[in-house]
Amino acid sequence: MATLGCAPKDDGEGKDEGGSDRGDGDSKPKGKKEVEPHTRREADERAMRIPIPEVLQQRLADDCYYINRRRRLVRLPCQTNVGAILECYVRHFSASVLALGDRRPQPQRAAPERSVGLCREMADGLRITFDHALPLVLLYPQEQAQYEMVTSSTFFFPTEERASDAGRSQEAPWPGPSPPQPSESQAVAGPAAPKRRRAEAEATRAPRRSTRHSTHCHWQAEDRASPQAKRSVPKLFPHLQKTPVHSAAPSPIALTPGKEGSAMFAGFEGTTEEINEILSWKLVPDNYPPGHQPPPPSYIYGAQHLLRLFVKLPEILGKMSFSEKNLKALLKHLDLFLRFLAEYQADFFLESAYVSACEAHYSSKNPRTLC
């Protein structure tokens, strides 16, 4: 993980071997066979460059500093996990395409970079890749023990309790552990002092996120008098910056299609069915993952670790086979997603996400307190 902040290096060895083969006149046919794979690989690596915006590069540097120099950890599970970020982006992208007048009954006229279907495939591919790559290449050594703890079965609720919670939160596209619904007096009079302190700190941070500007993603739960309820539904929804829809006092869009969600799309070019389809789309089914299995990393980790993936992504994609057309479309969608992260980086990359190892350990031992 020492190279997380650095882009993968060019395969210089392959280039040297190719040069030596060309100079070997006694084995010209063999040299030709060896040169072409190296040449293709070097061309693929050049094509796989995924430029990371400067503001996100600074976030990577900050991440490295907090973990390695200040010995801090990201508090887990994150309030805004990778699945939530990807789902928010797909809705943001879909609404943007709809606002520009692209109708899905005529997909042949839409450019690949404006294809909602390709955007969804990209998001799902990132989720799957993140789940596989995180324990292998996305963790610093200091984070390994935390990973083993948060992915253990003891970190999450028993199956019976999770099943009952799932019935109360059918909307949620990720199975974040939902606490019982306490009364306000019970929430205030909880016995754990550290839990109260974190709840108060979260309540003081919330206005800073929601008042930054009127056109960005918000968590759906806005009841600041009940921090526990706010944590139990960490949903993001798009308030588009380049659309004619504006609200003096932004309110969250309901996940299920309804009057509230449709009202937020007033002025969009599109049918009610199109708008409802955007609002109701989910990255994964409600019953994923099964209740007897711990959630995957994309349900636990957040923007900090997702951004690390983009440092390793060129190397990962370089080992896959893509046609030139598909690769070009994929890279375009990845670039658009990075722009989205850069635009809302102040909301996704919070300094308060980094806590001392002791506090991170406490959070891991008390999964009811979602970050």
UniProtKB/Swiss-Prot annotation:
Q: What is this protein called?
A: MSL complex subunit 3B
Q: Which domain of life is it from?
A: Eukaryota
Explain the purpose of this protein.
Probable non-catalytic component of the MSL histone acetyltransferase complex, a multiprotein complex that mediates the majority of histone H4 acetylation at 'Lys-16' (H4K16ac), an epigenetic mark that prevents chromatin compaction.
Q: Which organism is it from?
A: Mus musculus
Q: Which keywords, in A-to-Z order, does the entry hold?
A: Chromatin regulator, Nucleus, Transcription, Transcription regulation
Compositional bias ranges of the Basic and acidic residues kind: 8-47
The GO annotation for biological process reads: chromatin organization; regulation of DNA-templated transcription
Which stretches of sequence are listed as region Disordered?
Answer: 1-47, 160-230
